[in-house]
Regions:
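RecA-like P-loop NTPase motor core
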Residues: 96-147
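Post-Walker A helix-loop "phosphate-sensing" segment adjacent to the P-loop in P-loop NTPases
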Residues: 21-31
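Post-Walker A alpha-helix
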Residues: 15-16
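Conserved glycine(s) of the Walker
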Residues: 10-11
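Hydrophobic anchor at the beta1->P-loop junction of P-loop NTPases
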Residues: 4
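Structural recognition of the conserved hydrophobic beta-strand(s) that form the central parallel beta-sheet
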Residues: 60, 82-90
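Conserved P-loop NTPase "ATPase switch" module shared by AAA+ and STAND
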Residues: 47-71
Length: 147
């Protein structure tokens, strides 16, 4: 999962529109998508049915689709063999994604560029000590993992 963020007027909606045109009109759209995997836009009321019939695609969707924040969507993403690019400024608490896969979309003059939002990481737990006994149960909580 990759997340693309950005302020208004940075090209997020334009990216989705261009991908949609390329998908619907092919070469006559004037948009040339260079990618080894098919790139698809997921949107609309039938999103779940469409997603269940897509395999091995790169799927783009944006925050205009209300389903992006639902547990139902998160469950479908977790059970899918597709790669997802989600364009949103919201936190997606139901989905597991890496901070290394959050990109910002920013405009520079008349050109749009992507840049990593979080460029450095540090290890939170630097040393793992061996456990002297086998626990019967291990409880963990991670609200951002989606589980």
């Amino acid at each position: 999962i990759t997340i693309i963020q950005g302020d208004s007027a940075t090209g997020k909606t334009t990216l989705i529109n261009m991908l949609r045109q390329a998908e619907n009109l092919g070469r006559s759209s004037g948009v040339d998508v260079v990618c080894e995997a098919p790139c698809r836009v997921l949107e609309g009321a039938n999103w779940k049915l469409l997603l269940q019939n897509m395999h091995g695609n790169i799927i783009f969707t944006d925050e205009e689709n209300a389903f992006i924040n639902t547990e139902e969507f998160a469950a479908e993403v977790r059970n899918s063999d597709n790669y997802f690019v989600l364009i949103t400024r919201e936190n997606l608490y139901n989905l597991p994604y890496s901070v290394e896969e959050i990109y910002g979309l920013h405009a520079s003059g008349k050109y749009q560029n992507t840049k990593k939002v979080y460029q450095q990481m540090y290890q939170i737990y630097s040393e793992m000590l061996p456990c002297q006994s086998e626990p019967e149960k291990l409880l963990v909580e991670d609200s951002n993992s989606g589980y």
